[in-house]
UniProtKB/Swiss-Prot annotation:
Gene Ontology terms, MF aspect: structural constituent of ribosome
Signal peptide: none
HAMAP family named among the record's database cross-references: Ribosomal_bL27
Protein name, entry field: Large ribosomal subunit protein bL27
Gene3D superfamilies: 2.40.50.100
Organism: Leptospira interrogans serogroup Icterohaemorrhagiae serovar Lai (strain 56601)
InterPro entries: Ribosomal_bL27, Ribosomal_bL27_CS
PANTHER family (alphabetical): LARGE RIBOSOMAL SUBUNIT PROTEIN BL27M, RIBOSOMAL PROTEIN L27
GO cellular component: cytosolic large ribosomal subunit
Disulfide bond annotation, renumbered to this chain: none
Length: 84
């Protein structure tokens, strides 16, 4: 017979790593070509002038310049980069 009761195992105690999504460069900031502007799931922000869209929907600058966030419609926002 067991001298002590079996220690129960907890079913909690796990968590996933954060995905670190969100805006990385804000409006008016200067960026270099290739800088990541927004990390997102789906196209919450759409690519505008001089902005590329990665396969995971990441927006990145195609040219060096200043970031501008623009409303396309009431619901859609696009991110553009204008050369200085």
């Amino acid at each position: 017979m067991a001298h002590k009761k079996g220690g129960g195992s907890s079913k909690n105690g796990r968590d996933s790593n954060s995905q670190r999504l969100g805006v990385k460069r804000f409006g008016g900031e200067s960026v270099l070509a290739g800088n990541i502007l927004v990390r997102q799931r789906g196209t919450k922000f759409r690519p505008g002038n001089n902005v590329g869209l990665g396969k995971d929907h990441t927006l990145f600058a195609l040219v060096t310049g200043k970031v501008k966030f623009e409303m396309v419609t009431k619901l859609k926002m696009q991110v553009s980069v204008y050369p200085e």
